[in-house]
Regions:
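Feature for intrinsically disordered/low-complexity regulatory segments and propeptides
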Residues: 2-160, 164
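Intrinsic disorder/low-complexity polar-acidic segments
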Residues: 149-194
Length: 194
């Protein structure tokens, strides 16, 4: 019985050491991810923008327009924004433009980017959709969603998750953030003895 207990303790130590090394090896990436999340959370803005045929019927000029200046740009009252590839695909979807076609135009030569801006201006003026939710981070549009989309704050959600996990004894083992995704993985650093 004592040999089995010693073997189990040895296995537990191996697991603990392996988990600790994994946590230490990923600590820099986890820290960078969490800093990026907080920093981008400070500059993220959501706008509800009216678009479509309703504006035309009521003789209103467009609230958002598109132009080309090295990139396809979205112009709003709050400023001029570059379009992330994700936003271009979502704009295409919302306005009934083939997504692949619009992405190719937006990343092409100057004449193609100008054509992309023209296509977006025409479609945004005639779409049956009346409003969209625009998510910006700094001077870049990252997402164009339905105006009924439930807006969630990733900073608050991930912070609450990490705090609760920490109260349960867990630590962040890995984390990742791109322009459109964020996730964090937690682990209990001590094995659970059964």
């Amino acid at each position: 019985m004592e040999t089995a207990m010693t073997t189990q303790q040895g296995l537990n130590e191996v697991v603990i050491n392996k988990v600790q090394r994994m946590i230490e090896n990923k600590a820099v990436g986890v820290q960078a991810t969490m800093e990026r999340l907080v920093n981008e959370g400070k500059i993220a803005q959501d706008y509800i923008a009216p678009i479509g045929v309703e504006l035309r019927r009521n003789d209103h000029s467009p609230i958002i327009t598109f132009s080309e200046n090295g990139h396809v740009l979205m112009n709003m009252q709050s400023g001029q924004y570059t379009l992330h590839g994700n936003a271009i695909g979502q704009l295409a979807d919302k306005m009934g433009i083939p997504s692949r076609y619009l992405r190719q135009l937006a990343s092409g030569d100057e004449w193609q980017r100008q054509l992309a801006a023209t296509v977006l201006n025409e479609h945004s003026g005639w779409t049956q959709r009346t409003r969209v939710l625009i998510r910006t981070v700094g001077q870049q549009v990252r997402g164009v969603l339905s105006d009924s989309y439930r807006r969630l704050n990733s900073v608050e959600i991930l912070t609450a998750f990490v705090q609760e996990a920490s109260q349960q004894g867990a630590v962040i083992a890995d984390a990742y953030m791109s322009d459109t995704k964020v996730w964090a993985e937690t682990i209990l650093p001590q094995p659970i003895v059964v």
